[in-house]
Curated annotation (Swiss-Prot):
InterPro entries: Glyco_tran_10_C (IPR055270), Glyco_tran_10_N (IPR031481), Glyco_trans_10 (IPR001503), GT10-like_C_sf (IPR038577). It is found in: Golgi apparatus, Golgi stack membrane. This is Alpha-(1,3)-fucosyltransferase fut-5. It comes from Caenorhabditis elegans. Keywords: Calcium, Glycoprotein, Glycosyltransferase, Golgi apparatus, Membrane, Metal-binding, Signal-anchor, Transferase, Transmembrane, Transmembrane helix. Pathway: Protein modification; protein glycosylation. Residues 1-7 are cytoplasmic.
Amino acid sequence: MKHNTLRAVFQFSFFIGICTFIMIAGYSYQINYNQRMGIFYGGNITFKKVPKVVIYTATPFFDVPIENSILRDCSEKIKNSCTVTSNNKTFPIADAIVFHSRDINETKLSFFNKNRRYDIPYIMMAMENPFFAGLTVYHNFFNWTMTYRTDSDIFHPYGAFVKSYVPAEVNYSEIWNSKTKETLWMVSNGNAQNKRKELVEKLIKKGMSIDLYGQLYKKEPAECPRRRGPPGCDVKFHSPYKFAIAFENSNCKDYVTEKFWKKAGIYKTVPIVMSRKIYRDLGIPDSMYIAVDDYPNLEEFVHHIQNVTSNEEEYMKYHKWRKQFKIVDTNEGNIGFCQLCQKLAGYKRKLVPHKVYENLNSWHSTSTCDNSFATRFL
């Protein structure tokens, strides 16, 4: 009888324990579910359909909030399963946090260090090269990088070219007939590290015809003032030029910005760059641009430009790529965020290994740049 009583007490205690465990587990699940639905800390975050991936952008991009519209050119599958928001209340439920390097301040850094979430990646987004990225010392803070460099965790280029499935119809005669001027240089930043201003002015002294516009030269096209012109005026302004200077403010690994992509793309000019290696390393066709370092001196370079300027057959060789390829303008950041959504989906399935950058500055450093190029010609 005594043994039966003890057995009954044990069974009852075990039963109570199991019930308690189920209640706690169920409650924990409900809390987690409610948080995923945006019901936490008295918040009022709501999604019509709970996304599989939530990306919280903790900083703006040059003071402009990064919102879900950044995904507008992604596939429907990505848009239906991923949300990008700058709403601070999504911090506890986010699957990743993105910081733009030029918009991080000490207050934000202190908050996210103090309230660190170790279960999700902190992502550094930097579209500027190391000289202008605005990075200070971030030790063991970031897990992923999202930059223009191909070795970033998320490749976030300014532009890209893709092969056309069907050869495009290109009116070469129309392109040639629209070209009535030689070369344009539109430039705003005079604080370049690579002496591009000195190189351009040396080219002019060597006989190259270059029209100079932009903040650096305090000259704006009357028909298309910066940020105030009518839609499409930039295309109309650039279209008469055969060539356009596309020198970046620094010569860094993989650093090819809209200066190149727009000139070759919608402007239909031939970009002139400093060094071929940077562009060739990205797989950009050699015939899409002209590189100064293909020539032993500036005299021979200028002679080539002048020869091509007056020769339709030679000039149109730099447009033949248009039949097979097209340029995708990713300057609005969509390609990078599309890829980020995809990677995070894999991360949630534990397909992406956890990592942390011990010293981000050593990765995104000026050692990836070579600004000595122009000096050999000056």
